[in-house]
Amino acid sequence: MQLDKKIINHVHCLGIGGIGVSALAEILLKKGCRVTGSDVSPNKNTERLQRLGAEIIFNHDGTAITQADCAVYSSAIGATNPELMAAKQAKIPLLKRGEMLANLMKEYQSIAVAGAHGKTTTSGMLSHAFVEANLDPTFMVGGVLNNSQTPARVGNGHYFIAEADESDASFLFMHPDIAVVTNIDADHLSTYDGDFNRLKQTYIQFLEQTAQDGVVVLCLDDPILREIAPLLSRRVITYGFSSDAQYRVVDYCQQGIQSLFQIHSPQRKAPLTVKLSMPGQHNALNATAVTAIADVVQMNEPALLKSLADFPGVDRRFTIRGEMILPKGNALIIEDYGHHPNEIKATLAAARAAWPERRMVLVFQPHRYSRTRDLMTEFVSVLAETDWLVLLEVYSAGEMPIPGADGMALIKMMSNGMAQKTTFVPLLQNLPETLQKLSQPNDIIILQGAGNIGSIVTALVQTHG
């Protein structure tokens, strides 16, 4: 559907408390639209939007939608949702979240960041760089930036930076001027009928929708992207640790939770020395993608380097929450949103490099029964890399339980040695008591997952710390 700004004054957002829809609602509000919305319960996102003027009700009975010019919904909204059904009955135009986003991006020079892992941090880092360089961008990312405490911004500049979502294939609504893909992995396969090749072909279609004179930026360390790169008709810029990448990371080292490295590129005679206030080789890759894009738009180099050095990160991405007080010392609490085996692996590697002598306690809440089923072997392998595992029950994210894909099924797949250093906690509210009993002074406790595991942070840090 084509968005006609002349007649769209009132937008209703279903599931307005979700990070993606809330970010879109914030942009619409700041562009002068009347925004109404609904969700099942209030959260930080709805509170932020209400302060900006959004009118929100906390039910889905279908009564709030009938006066809107159009309605926006995400893939989390099911076909039987009363508001969705009411909108159809009232013949109110319905747009998917990604469709509305793509319509808004048409007004700008657009940059879309896609990938299975790292797209939120990369798009957030890129947005921060554009702000620091006084390019006054509009942006919409999939997480709350720690410095601005918002996932969205409306600027007066020419650029719109957005996270592109492959989980529901809605990135196909986009036709960006610059497209970035950080990696491709076997996730959200239910959208693609379980066919990884179809997922790969959809990425190719997305990249080929980049403007004819546009640029595609790909991580050459990813074997699928390496395979795809020569197939594309657009100009391709590559980055990575790989020796044949155009933007190449060299001399990477981690000092505590900071990263230092150099970037060799065809744009420069001398390597670019980069410092990040965040750990992990994956973040060095994210910063290198940002550097490649900065060169495309001819960003001021000192502004770029400053922005990379002072980028404070995105909420729930290796976020240090505080300390839990124990009888004989403290344990450090870190929260990370990663919910795929490769993301967990990157988090553990960064934590090990930062605190090599300290015991790692991983508290993992699996996200979706389908993902747990599809990646069971990979989860078992990566979870074995921690010193002690506290396993929570699967966060369903609206899915019905799948036999053999719950927390106990994961434990049954583990080796005897790993099972002996695993504690299963079926109820999240019992986690603080469990951690008090098993934690040791100087432990690093990582709360890992995309579900509601973060809701327990306050209890851990304030009640026990």
Curated annotation (Swiss-Prot):
Transmembrane segments: none annotated. Gene3D superfamilies: Mur ligase, C-terminal domain, Mur-like, catalytic domain, NAD(P)-binding Rossmann-like Domain. It is an enzyme of class 6 (ligase). InterPro entries: Mur-like_cat_sf, Mur_ligase_C, Mur_ligase_C_dom_sf, Mur_ligase_cen, Mur_ligase_N, MurCDEF_pg_biosynth, UDP-N-AcMur_Ala_ligase_MurC. The keyword Cell membrane does not apply. Keywords: ATP-binding, Cell cycle, Cell division, Cell shape, Cell wall biogenesis/degradation, Cytoplasm, Ligase, Nucleotide-binding, Peptidoglycan synthesis. Disulfide bonds: none annotated. ATP binds at residues 115-121. Pfam families: Mur_ligase, Mur_ligase_C, Mur_ligase_M. It is found in: Cytoplasm. The keyword Amino-acid biosynthesis does not apply. Belongs to the MurCDEF family. HAMAP family: MurC. This is UDP-N-acetylmuramate--L-alanine ligase.
